[in-house]
Amino acid sequence: MKPLTVMTAHASAPPAEGGVAADFSAETWWLSLIKAVFIVAFLIVSVIMAIWTERRVLGRMQTRPGPNVNGFLGIPQLIADAAKLIMKEDFWLRGAEKFIYILAPVIAAFSAFMIYAVIPFGPQVSILGHSTPLQLTDFPVAALYVLAVTGFGVYGIILGGWSTHSTYPLLGAVRSAAQVISYELSMSLSMLTVFLASGTMSTSGIVAAQERVWWGLAMIPSLLIYVVSMVGEVNRLPFDLPEAEGELVAGHMVEYSSMKFAWYYLGEYINMFNVSAMCTTLFLGGWRSFVLASFWPGANSGWWPMLWFVAKVWAVMLFMIWTRATLVRIRYDHFMKLGWKFLIPVSLTWFVLVTVVRAYRAFSGGSTRVLLLVLAVVFLVAMTILFLLPDGGREEDRPEGASGADEDSEDDVVAPDEEFDAFADGFPVPPPPGQRLPPSPRTRRAAVATAAAGATTAPSSATSDQEGTDD
């Protein structure tokens, strides 16, 4: 048989380890409506519980009580916060782009609700006599739909920062755009490895492909890359650079109040549940219970799988809360270096290796799960060693007095006493029309020192002239 014929036959045949997508043949419009209402209610209630849980967990980790005064365990505090946001003054900026200023937080919030439409909560169940999967919808490229909606949601942040015509929100929006471009690349590459291993981009098909082993175990590098990228994707510590309080006050949300601010706040927490649900679907078996199914035949049937799915999602959520309590915000250049110089090259290399394994499986027809697991462990050890090796190009590793400039180039020589003025050209961004940045503290100190030196020099010159006259 010719090689081209063999390749065509393998391409047209179903994947050896691919999953089967959910069956929506018996779906009715009112079933879809019930599922949509359930998803919205589930996300809103989950956000309320996540805010309370985060406050309590952070309080415990920081050796303080947390909310515990208003009612039982401080739970009514959430009602007070919601009432405060609703009744706060809703001010409007005079120079803002009014339509986009209102539209931006709505885009950020409603795009977050759209992702759960393709997330499978469980298998086929019976609802009012109709057999239907616990999923609103699914299609062959559902995972790519998630990436598209995630990128669309960033427009809410970018437009919100630009429409205010203010410096801090604009800088936060620019940071958000750079952050999404940087970390969505590595996230997409980690997801592509799952598509290759599963043989499908359908979310329900990916869950079905993990019936025997989770991809988080068989492809540990993909899981680690996704976990780091998802924290950067949702702007959480240590990657919350677009809304860094110490630098940008609140980033793109500085000029928003009342319900417009609440839309951003709601969208941020829903996005945390979105990336947690995708992590569960892609790497943790989705609604399948790997341990309970080994001794309980009915663990992955009926309504029980929804409980396993929610438990996994909350486990990932608690991990993000844990990182917020234990890690500090990293520097922006270190953040970009981690994304472009480490995560993207590592994820691209791992993607190539998984592609080779997938091609081997397509031509041999055998199972490659053990091969993937061994390759993942070896690759993880190699990348850990490379990551821990000292970087000779870092400034702190150079000997004292050394410079990174070329010794033979006279243009690179910088005077040791010359100070760099970061605010010389309107750093960090040019000020809006009609505004001027105040002089930096260094500039003010230099001006005071120059004036003091001039005042000291003038009496000295007068004294010298007087002594010359007396002689």
Annotated model-derived regions:
Residues K2-D471:
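Selective transmembrane helix interface/packing segments
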